[in-house]
Amino acid sequence: MATLSAARRLGTILAAATIVVYAQVARYDFVNWDDPEYVLQNPAVSAGLSLGGVAWAFTHRHGETWHPITSLSHMLDCQLYGLWPGGHHLTSVLLHVCATLLLFGVLCALSGEPAPSAFVAGAFALHPLRAESVAWVAERKDVLAGVLWMSTMWLYVAWVRRPSPRRYGAVVVTFMLGLMAKPMVVTLPLVLLLIDAWPLGRSLPLRRRVVDKLPLLALAGVVSVVTIVAQQPAVVSLEKVGVTDRLANAIVAFAWYVQKTVWPSGLAVFYPLELPVPVRSVAVSGLFVACVTAVAWRARRTRPWLFVGWLWYLVALLPVIGLVRVGDQAVADRYTYLPGIGLSLMVAWSGVELASRWPAMKPVVGAVATVLLIALAAATWVQVGYWRDNVTLYERALRVTHDNFVAHTNLGSALLAENRVSDALQHYREALRINPTAGVAHANVGVALAASGDHAAAMAAFERALELDGRDAATHVRVADLLAGEGHLADAIAHYQQAAALEPTSPAVHNNLGFLLAAQGNLTEAVELAPAEPRNRMNYARALARSGRRGDAIAELRELLRRRPDWQAAERELSQVLAADPDPARRTEAVALAEELVRTATTPDAELLAILAVAYEGAARFADALRAWSEALTAARATGRTDLVPGLEAAVAACRVRSQVGGTR
């Protein structure tokens, strides 16, 4: 009873401490690395949960891998919170708390010792290396996989102690869910083999214990193949990073993660891969790993926690150690989320041994463990704070790393989003200096130059980017936008067509191409490009209206609204087309539609009020039009729409004149 009471008290403290350290993320935004792909710019996810979304999750890659359970969790967040980043962050925090409590419960169930179990769970929850997994929305897969990893372990322990087909079935199902949250869970069957030896102490022959894991190993094999296929576009080729370099970096990484676990300073969102890997680093790291492995092997019977903890660490790291490379990072904090537990096991039960050999040391061991966890929590609070926004995150990375292409690139994009064009260009040029053969680096410089108004230099940068990587659809789009802005529609269309061929499923590319085709007068071709795409139909309707075919435009817009009755953009367009029609009945309909749009708006909308004013003028209701124009001007000033103010001021003045002279239309 006393043990149970102590476990509950420690569990409550663990949960509270974890929430306190990470709750600050509720105020944080999304970051511009992976979060757009995972949530913000992924219509299948941002639309929330639906049958179509569930089907998409199980049949498509998401973030260059297959993890449908993670995709569904992002969809559920969008269903609950929309695109409020705080909600997405808090879900990750709650999942991390759950993983922590499950780990604590599993270790208590395995060992019957709450104190060392609490230390391991506390180090798992509160170590600065965990900040990336919890504070980064795109890393939802880590915390979700953590919950399912711990759940599988707990169910496995229950099955070992009271075997039954139903209990084993629960183990298999939960493990499969874990694999579908993050494929890194494939190593769990091997970790279960380790805990068979300690602390479970199963006396069955090794062969029998392996047979127990065969269904799990089979599932792991299938998901490994699926993952390799799904990640193929993102896998770094052997020509770029050879086998020798991969092995060298893996050896250094095994030691680096231990170093950062012991002394977590200089942590960053991205660590550039240095090639060739320094021979000295490989030698020292290899010697360290070999020595610890030898010590753990020799202690496998007398101190089994050293052997189990060290092999847990090594085995769990294998999928992400870089032998199969996805991305250009040398190491990553998030990769320690599950492997780091093994290192904590080694420390915690060494403390137990120390206290049992010298009972007088027990209070000292407890005090040291408590101070360590408090220090880790304080360091994690600081580390989580770096995730408050893009600029803070990448500036931190640049302070603690060298020649960081990713940090310069992403910081440039963040600064450009804040309209700090000169600062953005500086970081884009630094990225270009680091990797002058990267097409994306030239393209980013082009984006910043275009934003600064230097279109000639921007075009030169884009052309160089396409020379290096002609299959970059985004650069073709940027060139097309620049050409279209200068009136070179034919050339712009050619680049959009190349972008559409490279990204045949991109709605934005097809929409913009359709708009340009319609502007050029190729109405039929514009619609045939993607006949079911609503925005293409909208562009078609606009082109019809501009060419004087108002009746056809109205029919097209009515059909759009029949299919999507809540599409306000189509309602706005229809109101404007109706207001310009010579038929008085249609002008009256324009007024009714515009009035309804204004009435249902949650806040004063200058553009909606302007549409209403146009509708009133079309119906010769000039007093009402003057009032609507004035309200639109007030709304524009109140909401900071300074771009609309001059035009609205002119409209108010013109309408006032028309109303005074009896209203000439």
What residues fall within each predicted segment?
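Polytopic membrane enzymes that build or remodel cell-surface glycoconjugates and lipids
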Residues: 1-453, 467, 474, 512
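Register position in tetratricopeptide repeats
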Residues: 417, 451, 485-486, 519, ...
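Conserved alpha-helical positions within TPR/SEL1-like repeat arrays
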Residues: 405-417, 440-451, 474-485, 508-515, ...
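Canonical positions in the second alpha-helix
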Residues: 397, 430-431, 464-465, 498-499, ...
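TPR-repeat structural position
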Residues: 387, 421, 455, 489, ...
